[in-house]
Amino acid sequence: MVQSNNPDSTSRYRTRRSFAKIPAVMDVPNLIAIQTESFKKFMDDGLTNAFADISPIESNTKDMCVEFGKHEFGEPKYSVDECKERDVSYQAPLFAEIRFINRETGEIKEQDVFMGDFPLMTPRGTFIINGTERVVVSQLVRSPGVYFSAERDKTSDKTIYNAKIIPSRGAWLEFETDKRDILSVRIDRKRKQPATLLLRALGIAETREEIIDILGDSEMVIRTLDRDPATTKEESLIELYRRFRPGEPPTIDSARTLLDGLFFNPQRYDLAKVGRYKINKKLEFDPENDASTLTQEDIIATMRYIVGLHDGAEGVQVDDIDHFGNRRIRTVGELIQNQFRIGLSRMERVVRERMSMQEPDDITPQSLVNIRPIVAAIKEFFGSSQLSQFMDQSNIAAGVTLSVVCPHWALAVCLVSAQASKFETFITPTTAACARLRPLKVLTSVLSARWQRMPA
């Protein structure tokens, strides 16, 4: 007799015993571990990282700030079964330690502030939202990093090359060639402009000779320099700001702040560890480089690589976008953390506005924090996101309920609600194909066609 050694499988149910003579090779793994472990990681580290991303929140005059400390959860008001019966959400109150610091006087006020009720995961890896069991499905996305692709131009039949630096959080940076052999840059999917404009704006190179020394004397580099409207760093900053934010009066300081905030501010831009690893590997950088934001070396190496692709250099090649090595899975913990960060960023603007409107002596952490943006962001995710779905359960309960009235109706409902491939042996293939589109109509036809043939 063999007894299962998996503690998860015996914690709530009877021990499964095997009377086979050949022992089991391995125990059945916990099939929902990807859900439970991801949410546990979010509870332990994800919330802390989300608070750290916006802390501290400084006033416009920099004389006051708000800092976030440790956080903790209270006890849920109802159990999982009670939440289902009462049609309420299974959630627990979230409290955060918030400090208000007046830098002029040195005064510090600290309070534990209620940040809203946060949905908790059940032992089954699901969530109870308004009494309904829901599950957050994982998302397959393109992994952060740098990717190079090529395609044929339909009019000129030339090969067009494209390079994308994709972060985990922040603005995309894209380089692309065109049929006129000009290298352009597109920042955060805005209008494209000559790529040399970005080099001058970042202060990497300013003169024509310096840019040629960095990128080489390729014909495409020469053509791009000829199309560049700026010749100095200041002109490049103004031109970049004018194209990125048309209608606003451009200044050098505002343009420099915009550029630094887009790619070099850790609070707004994050490559994540996997993104930095893939950039280091693709561009042959030092593996010890662990910068979470872009560096000037990243931009230079990316431009050199795409120039090499255009010129047919050896050792450079495009990437297969559909390869699973260039994709990753966003699990439930990361998805909720991203949504929680959106709520915090909305709250950040409210806190900054209230600091400028209230008297410093009357300000308390409780009076500054407005939890409505956070609550709304979490509610929006669980209620209307495509990744938050009703728990796909079998119809055992429904079948049992219907079987009390008529077991034949229960069988028909189970057939129609199952996948067509599972009940093609019971009904015709034509009806099975229609079941994917018109389940209620098929249910009627199944009942009318099979009613007489079913045994009493």
Model-derived regions, located:
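N-terminal non-catalytic structural scaffold regions of very large proteins
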Residues: 1-407, 412-415, 427, 452-455
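Structural and coupling elements of P-loop NTPases
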Residues: 84, 441-444
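Short glycine-rich loop/turn motifs
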Residues: 93, 431-434
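Short, conserved secondary-structure segments in the cores of folded domains
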Residues: 123-125, 422, 433-435
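Hydrophobic positions within alpha-helical membrane elements
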Residues: 136, 446-447
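Short, basic/aromatic recognition patches
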Residues: 419-426
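Conserved helicase core region in the C-terminal RecA-like lobe
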Residues: 434-441, 448-451
